[in-house]
């Protein structure tokens, strides 16, 4: 019996020992799944004792204690059943091959999944047009800083999945590996920050965490201004507007109104440039940098419209920083051929000073002056096509440095395999440009002028590397221009069809004609000759090709063909828009080939099968391409007009239309009816906005690092300063976060009501600011600042300085000094860690020392 008592005593002692070990572990309950930020430190209660770090009792320790106890008990020769219970018989041992299939594998992991996507309008909400971004690294760290899962986003979805996160674990998610031209996106309904905190659920649970990123060169707000060039007949010594702006949402949506005047809204323009300043232009490019917002326009040869003061090779630059045009000047003048216009553009075409008739302006069209303009993605280099010498020019936008040129390829590959050089080098005519991912895309055609064989008509797109100044050896895309495109004009009575099929270029006046029903004695006319005038890209990399009809620049509206005839001609152009699908392997499918339908509704009812003038723009993230067009309004009897159409790239439908001019009611003819009366189109998108801020948290272990499970601190006022001046303040939310955005940011109206957002005036790129937090404010009066920059990165860089506390103490204020990056460089790494003051007790035991021995 005494052994039993001793045994019970020993077992009880062991149990007490085990309980003391267990209760000695000071544990903390982590926030629930995805809500690590939703359990902030309560600022309204008494001072909080510092929360200890999580500690775990190793099962091995407890097992050792119990095992030793069992040995002791066994050594006493006692049956365990006498003390506690009768242990059941153990199950039969199973060999590997005899493991029952019905026993499921234990699932102990949870998942975090999501996408990293390109946020074109930087609103933190993903649209179905915003693609995934591949090659971004997403990593989960546990409380010890150990990687528990990592993945890299894949193309084309931008998806990642972290599959090995222990169930119930709190982790820190870091997003790294952003390319130089990619910046973290803004916070929003579909976007976290590059550092986030998640507590996963039980085994098999899945948490979703998405992140937006921004490519500043592709950013555009929802309703940017667009600009286009307009043409007026004759000498350009007038105040007629020849470059005008209009908002992206101009005009009306077909099917929503039968009032044609709805398609004229707005009828006024904020940005206008007059004819006497720039003359006739086609190519337009736009530069947006923190220092400048400027529009470039290149001189263009239209037979019935004169040049500006800079002549055939002029490139004009206009300040468009505000919503009205500023000063216009000549950036540079290229050698682009002689001006062959005469003294009178409408009737006699006489040259100066002899007064002899001029006939060679016809052939100069498409061969003199400049074609398209485009600009590098960094805004530092302007590209221009010289139609006279076939050169692609690189021009520094700041006016400094040399202007360099490279002749486009003229030894073009054969149209058919093995055909050799099917295009006479003298028939190679470049015109259109596009820029994407550092490469320049140059559009050109084989005009078949020397052979006059339509089978030789061909389109080519070559890539050019501006760094190495080399063209690719083979075209990125080429295809024959042999489609049956219907009729430029048709009617049933009398049966008439002016063919829209592309024709070889011709050096003298040539036309298909039909009597005009509206103007007796005058002739409707067309003779489509292709110029590949513009290249745009869809979000998936597919190319959109704008073809301009040379005939529309050779013949005017109700104008004679030459000084030797009184017959008046009304030109009807036969331009086109084609879609070359991305093939998924870095190439493009021929427009209209299998799997790449071309169904743009670029017609005017049954009268005209083609209405495009070739100039166009596509704003990233938008489903439409905006293209210049004659008779743009799809309503009856809206003819002899010029304007723009918005074509849906998936359906080909006309999503929107806007009329800029009508030649119907002009007392003196100034515009071009159904001819080429408009040039290129460009979007004047703003600079990508900037958002800064992020998190104040309780640094429980004092290491200056944001560890998973450490609590956020809400209710803290944060101030933004620049040059010692207060710009605004925000108050941290329950998740400890704060943010600042500029009042010009398009998302600012939706953020003004959120207390953790400070909407300020003056948050811009490449400037120095300070985040300040008064440490004496009530919300954090019992806290001190934790160690700063413990990762040895004090740059406050938005891609590298991610997880430590960045503030230093200046007096009684926590201060983070930082510089904003370029446009779109959102910075969510400006974090502040706080330590709670330890509560200290003083004193010891007071007792009556009866024997006076001090013990």
For every predicted segment, state its role.
Residues 158, 177-689:
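Sequence/structural signature of beta-propeller domains
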Residues 137-140, 167-188, 747-780:
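A short, solvent-exposed beta-strand micro-motif common in secreted/extracellular proteins
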Residues 12-24:
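Alpha-helical transmembrane segments
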Residues 96, 102-108, 190-216, 792-838:
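Extracellular beta-sheet/turn segments enriched in Thr/Pro/Gly and aliphatic residues
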Residues 1-8:
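Feature marks short, highly hydrophobic, charge-poor N-terminal signal-anchor/signal peptide-like helices
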Residues 104-125, 687-705, 717, 829-831, ...:
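A short, Gly/Thr-enriched small/hydrophobic beta-strand-prone motif that recurs across taxa
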Residues 120-128, 132, 142-164, 704-707, ...:
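Short, acidic Ser/Thr/Gly-rich low-complexity loop/linker segments typical of extracellular
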Residues 115, 137-141, 174, 695, ...:
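Beta-strand signatures of extracellular beta-sandwich domains
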């Amino acid at each position: 019996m005494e052994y039993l008592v001793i045994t019970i005593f020993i077992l009880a002692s062991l149990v007490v020992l085990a309980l003391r070990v267990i209760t000695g572990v000071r544990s903390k309950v982590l926030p629930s799944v995805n809500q690590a930020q939703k359990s902030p430190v309560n600022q309204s209660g008494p001072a909080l004792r510092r929360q200890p770090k999580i500690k775990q009792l190793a099962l091995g320790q407890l097992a050792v204690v119990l095992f030793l106890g069992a040995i002791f008990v066994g050594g006493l020769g006692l049956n365990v059943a006498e003390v506690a219970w009768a242990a059941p018989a153990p199950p039969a041992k199973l060999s590997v091959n005899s493991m029952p299939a019905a026993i499921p594998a234990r699932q102990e992991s949870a998942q975090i999944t999501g996408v990293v996507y390109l946020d074109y309008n930087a609103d933190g909400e993903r649209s179905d047009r915003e693609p995934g971004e591949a090659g971004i690294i997403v990593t989960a760290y546990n409380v010890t800083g150990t990687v528990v899962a990592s993945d890299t986003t894949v193309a084309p979805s931008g998806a990642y999945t972290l599959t090995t996160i222990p169930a119930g674990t709190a982790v820190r998610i870091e997003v790294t590996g952003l390319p130089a031209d990619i910046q973290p996106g803004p916070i929003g309904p579909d976007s976290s920050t590059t550092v986030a905190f998640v507590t996963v659920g039980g085994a098999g649970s899945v948490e979703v965490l998405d992140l937006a990123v921004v490519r500043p060169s592709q950013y555009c707000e929802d309703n940017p201004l667009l600009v286009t060039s307009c043409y007026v007949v004759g000498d350009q010594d007038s105040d007629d507007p020849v470059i005008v702006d209009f908002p992206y949402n101009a005009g009306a949506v077909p099917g929503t109104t039968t009032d044609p005047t709805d398609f004229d809204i707005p009828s006024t323009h904020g940005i206008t440039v007059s004819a006497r300043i720039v003359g006739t232009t086609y190519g337009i490019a736009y530069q947006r940098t923190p220092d400048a917002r400027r529009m470039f326009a290149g001189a263009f040869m239209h037979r019935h419209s004169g040049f500006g003061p800079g002549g055939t090779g002029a490139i004009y630059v206009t300040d468009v920083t505000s919503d009205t045009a500023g000063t216009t000047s000549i950036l540079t003048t290229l050698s682009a051929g002689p001006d062959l216009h005469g003294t009178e553009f409408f009737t006699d075409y006489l040259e100066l000073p002899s007064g002899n008739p001029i006939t060679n302006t016809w052939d100069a069209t498409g061969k003199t002056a400049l074609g398209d303009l485009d600009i590098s993605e960094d805004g530092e280099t302007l590209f221009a096509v010289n139609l006279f010498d076939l050169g692609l020019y690189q021009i520094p936008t700041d006016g400094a440095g040399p202007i360099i040129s490279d002749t486009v390829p003229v030894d073009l590959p054969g149209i058919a395999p093995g055909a050799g050089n099917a295009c006479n080098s003298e028939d190679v005519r470049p015109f259109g440009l596009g820029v994407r991912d550092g490469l320049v895309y140059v559009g050109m055609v084989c005009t078949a002028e020397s052979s006059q064989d339509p089978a030789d008509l061909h389109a080519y797109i070559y890539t050019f590397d501006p760094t190495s100044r080399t063209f690719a050896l083979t075209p990125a895309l080429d295809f024959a221009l042999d489609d049956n495109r219907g009729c430029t004009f048709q009617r049933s009575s009398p049966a008439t069809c002016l063919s829209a099929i592309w024709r070889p270029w011709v050096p003298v006046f040539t036309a298909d004609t039909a009597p005009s029903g509206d103007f007796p004695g005058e002739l409707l006319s067309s003779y489509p000759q292709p110029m590949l005038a513009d290249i745009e890209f869809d979000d998936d990399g597919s190319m959109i090709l704008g073809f301009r009809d040379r005939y529309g620049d050779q013949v005017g509206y109700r104008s004679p063909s030459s000084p030797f005839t009184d017959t008046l001609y009304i030109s009807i152009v036969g331009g086109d828009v084609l879609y070359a699908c991305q093939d998924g392997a870095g190439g493009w499918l021929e427009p209209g080939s299998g799997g790449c339908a071309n169904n743009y509704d670029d017609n005017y009812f049954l009268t005209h099968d083609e209405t495009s003038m070739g100039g166009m723009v596509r704003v990233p993230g938008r489903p439409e391409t905006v293209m210049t067009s004659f008779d743009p309004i799809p309503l009856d009897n809206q003819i002899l007009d010029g304007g723009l159409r918005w074509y849906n790239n998936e359906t080909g439908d006309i999503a929107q239309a806007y009329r800029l001019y009508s030649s119907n009611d002009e007392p003196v003819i100034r515009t071009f009816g159904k001819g080429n009366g408009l040039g290129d189109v460009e979007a004047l998108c703003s600079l990508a906005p900037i958002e800064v801020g992020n998190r104040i948290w309780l640094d429980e272990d004092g290491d200056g690092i944001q560890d998973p499970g450490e609590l956020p601190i809400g209710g803290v006022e944060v101030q933004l300063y620049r040059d010692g001046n207060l710009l605004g303040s925000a108050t941290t939310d329950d998740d400890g976060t704060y943010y600042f955005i500029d009042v010009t940011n398009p998302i600012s109206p939706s953020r003004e009501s959120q207390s953790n957002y400070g909407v300020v005036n003056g948050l811009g790129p490449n400037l120095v600011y300070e985040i300040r937090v008064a440490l004496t404010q009530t919300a954090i009066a019992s806290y001190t600042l934790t160690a700063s920059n413990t990762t040895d990165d004090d740059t406050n860089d938005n891609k590298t300085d991610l997880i430590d506390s960045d503030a230093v103490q200046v007096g009684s204020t926590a201060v983070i000094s930082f510089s904003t990056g370029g446009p779109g460089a959102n910075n969510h790494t400006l974090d502040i860690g706080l330590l709670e003051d330890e509560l200290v007790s003083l004193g010891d035991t007071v007792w009556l020392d009866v024997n006076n021995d001090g013990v």
